[in-house]
Amino acid sequence: MKEIQFKRAELEDKEVISHYFKHHTSRSCERTFANVYLWSRQYPVKWAIVEDALVFKSEDESHLAFAYPAGEPENVKKALEVLMEYSKERGIPFQMYNVTPDNFDMLEEWYPGRFQIEYNRDLADYVYEAEKLATLSGKKLHGKRNHINKFKTMYEGRWSYESVTKENLEDLSLIHI
């Protein structure tokens, strides 16, 4: 099997990655270039184009998983075949994340009964109304208000709002959440 050239997302990759996201939409926060770029500084996430499908790989010493590929269905299926072989060659069970119900339907059509889907609430996106999040109004956001107020008190005089520029972009990777 030809070796896949996975790499960390860099600013010059934005056009390619965004092209696939634009044409193969998802409501997941993981399908935005900003998210991919920033989190790849914190976590072992890399990307590659495999069979004309965009693939993300998360791998460390103890785990290997792939995001469901972004691409035309026939290319996604070809990419999945390559990724399953990639996992098999390493002796690691094939796993995917960021699989939507529609994606799972495609998997069932291509590979009946081969996969099981498990929902992991800890990895779910949170959706807020923009106005409520901006103002932190309402009972549901009380905890968020408290966290922000605690932060402001603890770090008084040591924090600021700044525009993100090329000069300070890499500093964002120093933020540990």
What are these regions (language model features)?
Residues 19, 29-102:
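Conserved donor-binding loop and adjoining core beta-sheet/short helix segment
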Residues 3-16, 138-139, 160-172:
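A short beta-loop-alpha structural element at the N-terminal edge
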Residues 71-167:
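Acyl-donor-binding surface of acyltransferase catalytic domains
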Residues 1-38:
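Generic N-terminal amphipathic/basic segments
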Residues 14, 29, 63, 134-136, ...:
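Residues in flexible loops and secondary-structure boundaries
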Residues 175-177:
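Conserved small/polar residues in nucleotide/adenosyl-binding loops
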Residues 12, 43, 61, 121-124, ...:
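Sequence-level motif detector for i,i+2 pairs with an aromatic at +2
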